Amino acid sequence: MASDIEIARGAKKKPIQEVAARAGVSPENLIPYGHDKAKISAAHLAGLAHNATGKLILVTAINPTPAGEGKTTTSIGLADAMNRIGANTLLCLREPSLGPCFGMKGGATGGGLAQIVPMEDINLHFTGDFHAITSAHNLLSTMIDNHIHWGGEPKLEAVRTSWRRVMDMNDRSLRNIVSGLGGPGNGSPSETGFDITVASEVMAILCLATDAEDLEARLARIIVGYTSEKEAVTAADIKATGAMMALLRDAMLPNLVQTLENNPCLVHGGPFANIAHGCNSVMATSAALKMADYVVTEAGFGADLGAEKFLNIKCRQAGLAPDAVVLVATIRALKMHGGLGKNDLGKVSYEALESGLENLGRHIGNLRSFGLPVIVAINRFTTDTEGEVHALQAYCEKLGVPVSLCTHWAEGGKGTEDLARGVTALIEKGEADFKPLYPDDMPLLEKIETVAKSIYRAGRVETTRAVRNQLAAWEKAGFGHLPVCMAKTQYSFSTDPALLGAPEGHVVRLREVRLAAGAGFVVAICGDIMTMPGLPRRPAAEHIHLNRQGQIEGLN
């Protein structure tokens, strides 16, 4: 079979105006970026308010292998399949980050015959949203330094400044740096660092804002540091909000592209799920629900991260409630969770598969605890045997969970029609009764412990007195009602990436907490997770190049 990029390059794309018409967007409400991508105008979004609301389908997964388990591919295949069976469906995905594209994972536009296009554009610069978000974030950094340099009011202490810089690249050498060297004319020396753009609070704010007014209000609430009296200083205090909004004027609008089968897809925002909240924008999801009968969206990494945050953060803030959840599982990941080495995942091992099924069972139980009906999607690989597939199907049937074998990578939407029928049947039963994991008024540390014990099955949360005092101070300052955003490894229920399967009684080490007052959550950084990733020993960038025709090769 051809490579992903070769398949995408051969796609028979329709003009974006035709794709927009399928989604009910008129030409005057379309802002084209070339022939195959566009933004949807604010006027169109505002005019959707009185439309009926569609059904929301969340796609999530078990804990993944480093290569991912095809969650995005399954989301695309499902949306194509639902349109094939006559269910008017819109797809909502996140924008890829350059870091993983050039790092370990590669692109994030699906694979095989389940892709969104234009693949190269979406994976790289797209419509410039990430550039705008990075620029807005770093403009605030610059204005903070300038405020300190000129002694502006309120008096912000350099040592109490908490705002770091960002860039959309994996670069471990920038995690911790000293800036302002070279004498008084070059700023005040201070320890700081860079995070990846997808971990930026500006990214989270853009993805959680309901409209331009809410976006500006959230930006204004960003806390950048404190005075000597420990009074919070915000982006509004240093008069940065207006200029940040100017940079984000176009980035706040959802992007429209198409699948290989010419179905419309909104791609907007891209926070990581292991170090941020891992969901596409509220504006895109809310708009899609007013534009189609069904909306398929995904949450990053496994259900312990992306889905937990989708349900406890995004749904809580935006008033959303999924009608069904698709849990993607692969035979190879289950065997890895059962103890098989990553180089042996193509080998048959019923013992490893049976042991690894506990990971799937844990995720099913967790999702059901939110009051949501679940269907398991088996993303089939060519190395899967009939016996292994039957063993997985039997396990799901034993738990009373519907299961569907999917071959969308090889067959596109046709290979996921059974899943599409299963999802619509599940929704028609009306069994969804969504409820978040914890109430707003629960203390912050207790919220962290609730996620750790209920979702991760940890025995306890271990942290420092400084972290406890910081959480107590934020509660006293009026932030105790906020949800928590757990930052931890995506490979395990625990904070140890090597502890696979379904561990219980482990210790979650809470190392640091950060207040994202504008986004509206408290980040709990656990274990050794980094908010600026590094490149692997053999980064994907080594294999990416331009051919003699000026086409990009190696981007998968």
UniProtKB/Swiss-Prot annotation:
SUPFAM superfamilies: P-loop containing nucleoside triphosphate hydrolases. Pathway: One-carbon metabolism; tetrahydrofolate interconversion. Its EC number is 6.3.4.3. It catalyses: (6S)-5,6,7,8-tetrahydrofolate + formate + ATP = (6R)-10-formyltetrahydrofolate + ADP + phosphate. ATP binds at T65, P66, A67, G68, E69, G70, K71, T72. One of its GO terms (biological process) is tetrahydrofolate interconversion. Keywords: ATP-binding, Ligase, Nucleotide-binding, One-carbon metabolism. The keyword Ligase applies. InterPro entries: Formate_THF_ligase, Formate_THF_ligase_CS, P-loop_NTPase. GO terms for molecular function: ATP binding; formate-tetrahydrofolate ligase activity. It comes from the Bacteria. Belongs to the formate--tetrahydrofolate ligase family. NCBIfam families: PRK13505.1. This is Formate--tetrahydrofolate ligase. It comes from Hyphomonas neptunium (strain ATCC 15444). The lineage of its organism: Bacteria, Pseudomonadati, Pseudomonadota, Alphaproteobacteria, Hyphomonadales. The gene is fhs.
